[in-house]
Amino acid sequence: MPKVAKKKVAARAVVDRARKYTLQEACALVKQAAPAKFDETVDLAVRLGVNPRHADQMVRGAVVLPHGTGQSLRVLVFAKGEKAKEAEAAGADFVGEADLVNKVQEGFMDFDRVIATPDMMGLVGKLGRILGPRGLMPNPKVGTVTFDVKTAVSEAKAGKVEYRVEKAGIVHARIGKVSFAENALHVNADALIQALVRAKPATAKGIYLRSITMSSTMGPGVRIDPVHFIGKTEEA
């Protein structure tokens, strides 16, 4: 058996797949069970009791993780005049107007987050077919269409995570790296879960937090018991 396969088998043995853990236990297990030599990303998958096919049950938003994501984001901003200067001062990697729109249309995609001032959306709209499928299209619901570019850029650089429920009712989001301390992963995961709780649609009925699973890039999934959040989260 190859060495990598042996490590994966050993990692799975650490986790009881039939058990649901507390969030703190899950953070410790994910770190312990990560089999790769590189600094694996830690993700959270939350299955919600919503039907995203219904517009009034779409769950979408963004949250700043207190300890960041461990990823260095390249931020592109569509702005002009003073707002362009503010974006540059805040640390944006790329700032421009029509010239930048043209550059993206020509194939430039060396960025991870896109922010735009409202007056630029007429131009940015031309990039819908390019940015949309990649989840990069600026949207006021997640704070990426705003005149407050200074805050938007600063939050993106600090570890602001965007989330959106998929067709199966699941939200996937990065919450850090295996190298993070257990408490940092715990705080980040809790911040995301509480953001999802606050985003619960009024039309969602029954159990809202159906399941929560934490995993590293190469490691096994660790199930977290949603009951630990029910007191704060849902009315059936």
Swiss-Prot record:
The keyword Cytoplasm does not apply. Keywords: Repressor, Ribonucleoprotein, Ribosomal protein, RNA-binding, rRNA-binding, Translation regulation, tRNA-binding. InterPro entries: Ribosom_uL1_bac-type (IPR005878), Ribosomal_uL1 (IPR002143), Ribosomal_uL1-like (IPR023674), Ribosomal_uL1/biogenesis (IPR028364), Ribosomal_uL1_3-a/b-sand (IPR016095), Ribosomal_uL1_CS (IPR023673). Gene3D superfamilies: 3.30.190.20, 3.40.50.790. GO terms for cellular component: cytosolic large ribosomal subunit. One of its GO terms (biological process) is regulation of translation. Coiled coil: none annotated. GO terms for molecular function: rRNA binding; structural constituent of ribosome; tRNA binding. The keyword Ribosomal protein applies. Belongs to the universal ribosomal protein uL1 family. Binds directly to 23S rRNA. The L1 stalk is quite mobile in the ribosome, and is involved in E site tRNA release. HAMAP family: Ribosomal_uL1_B. Part of the 50S ribosomal subunit. This is Large ribosomal subunit protein uL1. The gene is rplA.
